[in-house]
């Protein structure tokens, strides 16, 4: 071999000298190459041994890290394009009007009252004429779902149209909520839902009277209801599917109705009067005006007859700041006491009653809280009621699986959870329960007097 060729080869590959010591980086690169080679061979071998691995879908996709800006932007852009495409697939107002016109044109007499009806044959004809966007609604399954007792085998045009409208609204709302899903995982964090509601406020005529300075308190009040009931494990996020499935969003969007009755506003947690009521109560309790509630200030809540023992447990278990409660924690407290029949509220109160943290209430737990009721009765000049009688009544009402223990599920299943918890934490509630027969008789007498007049 010519010496020139040898020299050229040596200069072209300086690392080929076996005597030369490899650098640390070169060793790492070589190790990585070997690892990749052997791992690929092993992985390929696994695939060859079992063909079913090819059919298993990928179920984990790593989210971009904070420093991976390009990947984050790509993910955001792709999600935005996807949601825009989904939005274009929905029926717009003009297409909905056209659908209504086609349905009305193909109705089949006779009408039932003022309800226009349509049979399956014409139902399919409308589906062909309505266009590709409507295809999903014109199926045998949908027709059968809406078919009730019509002797001609028809369905109500209005019921079908309302079904389509509801579906379109659900998809629109899901897309709207998904725009605030920063992670793109089908969940909304507290800050995500806050942003959604904050941007929704200007579209709700019933909230026009709210001052902008109150917006942050309104948003906090609204968001807490979603998280109190839909996030029982306190993970800090709730599924978009759960938001759509519950009635809270319907209640919130009901505020678009400019002619909403006063009664409806009073019973709607999201209405301006309700939010102002809750916040006003908080301000009235805050006597030292420091923006927080102490145990003494909270003791004046409602009829001011809650026991000190129960209030102690509230401040032991709930999040506080230097022993005082902020507005967000207060909202959880209010939601629990105002909705005692709901499982989420019972879970909140049960945790406070379970002083031994055993997951159940026993005779000791019941006696611990009822003694405080007996003490308040003495202070108010009433004869204390025997604990044994109350204990027997509670166990008779709940009928727990274990005759000596009451679990949270026992309380929920009994449908008496609100009564039991009221008896144990509030003197006024206990007095109302104890005198229920006299109160019912008094109401009947008053009703009879009104009838006589």
Curated annotation (Swiss-Prot):
May regulate MCM3AP phosphorylation through phosphatase recruitment. May act as a negative regulator of ABCB1 expression and function through the dephosphorylation of ABCB1 by TFPI2/PPP2R3C complex. May play a role in the activation-induced cell death of B-cells. It is found in: Nucleus; Cytoplasm. InterPro entries: EF-hand-dom_pair, EF-hand_13, EF_Hand_1_Ca_BS, PPP2R3C. The keyword ATP-binding does not apply. Residues 273-308, 341-376 form the EF-hand domain. Interacts with MCM3AP/GANP, PPP5C, and the phosphatase 2A core enzyme composed of the PPP2CA catalytic subunit and the constant regulatory subunit PPP2R1A. Finds in a complex with ABCB1, TFPI2 and PPP2R3C; leading to the dephosphorylation of ABCB1. It comes from Rattus norvegicus. It comes from the Eukaryota. Its main location: nucleus. Coiled coil: none annotated. The keyword Plastid does not apply. Keywords: Calcium, Cytoplasm, Metal-binding, Nucleus, Repeat. Residues 1-27 are annotated as: Disordered. GO terms for cellular component: centrosome; cytoplasm; nucleus. CDD domains: PPP2R3C. This is Serine/threonine-protein phosphatase 2A regulatory subunit B'' subunit gamma. Ca(2+) binds at residues 286, 288, 290, 292, 297. Pfam families: EF-hand_13. PANTHER family: SERINE/THREONINE-PROTEIN PHOSPHATASE 2A REGULATORY SUBUNIT B'' SUBUNIT GAMMA, SERINE_THREONINE-PROTEIN PHOSPHATASE 2A REGULATORY SUBUNIT B'' SUBUNIT GAMMA. One of its GO terms (molecular function) is metal ion binding. GO terms for biological process: B cell homeostasis; cortical cytoskeleton organization; microtubule cytoskeleton organization; positive regulation of B cell differentiation; regulation of antimicrobial humoral response; regulation of B cell activation; regulation of dephosphorylation; regulation of mitochondrial depolarization.
């Amino acid at each position: 071999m010519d010496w020139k060729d040898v020299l050229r080869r040596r200069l072209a590959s300086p690392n080929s000298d076996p005597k030369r010591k490899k650098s640390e980086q070169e060793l790492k690169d070589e190790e990585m190459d070997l690892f990749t080679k052997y791992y690929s061979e092993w992985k390929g071998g696994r695939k060859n041994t079992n063909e079913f691995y090819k059919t298993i879908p990928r179920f984990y996709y790593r989210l971009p890290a904070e420093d991976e800006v390009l990947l984050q932007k790509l993910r955001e852009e792709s999600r935005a394009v996807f949601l825009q495409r989904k939005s274009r697939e929905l029926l717009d107002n003009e297409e909905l009007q056209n659908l209504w016109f086609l349905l009305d044109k193909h109705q089949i007499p006779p009408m039932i009252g003022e309800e226009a009806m349509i049979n399956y044959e014409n139902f399919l004809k409308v589906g062909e004429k309505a266009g590709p966007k409507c295809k999903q609604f014109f199926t045998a399954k949908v027709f059968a779902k809406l078919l009730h007792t019509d002797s001609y085998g028809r369905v109500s045009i209005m019921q079908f149209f309302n079904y389509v409208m509801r579906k379109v609204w659900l998809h629109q709302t899901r897309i709207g909520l998904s725009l605030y899903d920063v992670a793109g995982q089908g969940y909304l964090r507290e800050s995500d839902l806050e942003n959604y509601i904050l941007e929704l406020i200007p579209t709700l005529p019933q909230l026009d009277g709210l001052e902008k300075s109150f917006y942050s308190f309104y948003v906090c009040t609204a968001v807490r209801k979603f998280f109190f009931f839909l996030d029982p494990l306190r993970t800090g996020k709730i599924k978009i599917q759960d938001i759509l499935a519950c009635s809270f969003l319907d209640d919130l969007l009901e505020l678009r109705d400019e002619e909403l009755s006063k009664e409806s506003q009073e019973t709607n947690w999201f209405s301006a009067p309700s939010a102002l009521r809750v916040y006003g109560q908080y301000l009235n309790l805050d006597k030292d005006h420091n923006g927080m509630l102490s145990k003494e200030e909270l003791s004046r809540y409602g009829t001011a007859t809650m026991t000190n023992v129960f209030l102690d447990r509230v401040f032991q278990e709930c999040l506080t700041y230097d022993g005082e409660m902020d507005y967000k924690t207060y909202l959880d407290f209010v939601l629990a006491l105002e909705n005692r029949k709901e499982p989420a509220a019972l879970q909140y109160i049960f945790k406070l009653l379970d002083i031994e943290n055993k997951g159940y209430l026993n005779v000791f737990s019941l006696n611990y809280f009822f003694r405080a009721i007996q003490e308040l009765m003495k202070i108010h000049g009433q004869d204390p009621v025997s604990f044994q009688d109350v204990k027997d009544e509670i166990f008779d009402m709940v009928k727990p699986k274990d005759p000596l223990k009451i679990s949270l599920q026992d309380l929920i299943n009994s449908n008496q959870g609100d009564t039991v918890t009221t008896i144990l934490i509030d003197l006024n509630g206990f007095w109302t329960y104890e005198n229920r027969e006299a109160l019912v008789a008094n109401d009947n007498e008053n009703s009879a007097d009104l009838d006589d007049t």
